Regions:
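Class I (Rossmann-like) S-adenosyl-L-methionine-dependent methyltransferase catalytic domain
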Residues: 1-73, 77-133, 149-160, 169-263
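Short catalytic micro-motifs in class I SAM-dependent methyltransferases
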Residues: 144-148
């Protein structure tokens, strides 16, 4: 059947297919690439180190985020999930890669953090309405997942935040920064579809992140209410190798809060 597009999900799946299979980092089809990436644990990859993001640590130390129910998107070897669990969060952590989750479970067992629930699969499917991880969550955290999404999947990502984040809850992420000292592709969205690839991940300016996430509104018959507000947006601190925290200045760190009255 060739005329099978009826829904937004059908359109999104169709657009996924505009990218070369080897470019896939966001669906279950990309799991084998991530498995190969995590296969050699001795590689000098900064975020392979078992230490949390410096921005996440700062949010917690400053009291901006209180312990509650947390969802981590693209948890990798589990370093941030472990940190959250150690501070009293009830954690669900998702990743596409069986290899990454095997490593994360080993770390959790060693740390005595057996309460973390690790989930294998596509975060969009796992958090769909009536799915196991539908929320609500007090914190949704993403350290390096968002910048591996093609432009059209921002729609899916925003829908995930809207349905899974609790009123008054926080969303935080780190992602590639455009400009001097940054990392990632700065090609326009339209060119990505022409080339059929994401070129290692997408770089964003601070204003582009604000455009995607802050000032989002929800309209009713009588009013239009902002449902996501910016708390902080800055470059990640450059943490020394001996630091107990992870930090690389080619990344943005961002924290947003969902309005308390929004369901």
């Amino acid at each position: 059947m060739d005329r099978n597009v009826r829904t937004t999900d059908d359109v999104l799946a169709l657009m996924d297919g505009l990218f070369a299979p080897e470019a896939d980092r966001w669906t279950t089809g990309g799991a084998s690439w991530w498995d190969a990436f995590y296969a050699d644990r001795s590689k000098p990859v900064p975020f392979f180190a078992d230490k949390p993001d410096e921005n996440l640590d700062a949010y917690l130390r400053q009291g901006w985020i209180a312990p509650g129910r947390a969802l981590e998107l693209g948890c990798g070897p589990g370093r941030n999930a472990l940190h959250l669990a150690s501070l009293g969060f009830d954690v669900d952590a998702v990743d596409l890669s069986p290899a990454a989750l095997a490593w994360a479970r080993e770390r959790a067992e060693k740390a005595g953090a057996g309460s973390i629930r690790f989930h294998l699969g596509d975060a969009f499917a796992l958090t769909a309405a009536e799915a196991p991880l539908a929320g609500p969550y007090d914190l949704i955290y993403d350290s390096g997942c968002f910048h591996h999404l093609p432009p059209h999947r921002r729609i899916s990502y925003l829908a995930l935040l809207e349905r899974c984040l609790a009123p008054g809850g926080h969303f935080a992420l780190t992602c590639f920064a455009a400009g001097e000292g940054g990392m990632g592709s700065e090609l326009p969205d339209s060119d990505l579809y022409l080339t059929g690839g994401l070129h290692g991940g997408l770089a964003y300016t601070d204003d582009e992140l604000r455009h995607v996430f802050s000032g989002l509104t929800e309209a009713t018959e009588t009013t239009e209410t902002e449902w996501m507000e910016e708390v902080e947006l800055r470059r990640m601190n450059d943490e020394a190798p001996e630091s107990p925290l992870f930090g690389e200045p080619f990344l943005w760190t961002a924290l947003f809060r969902k309005a308390a009255g929004q369901g």
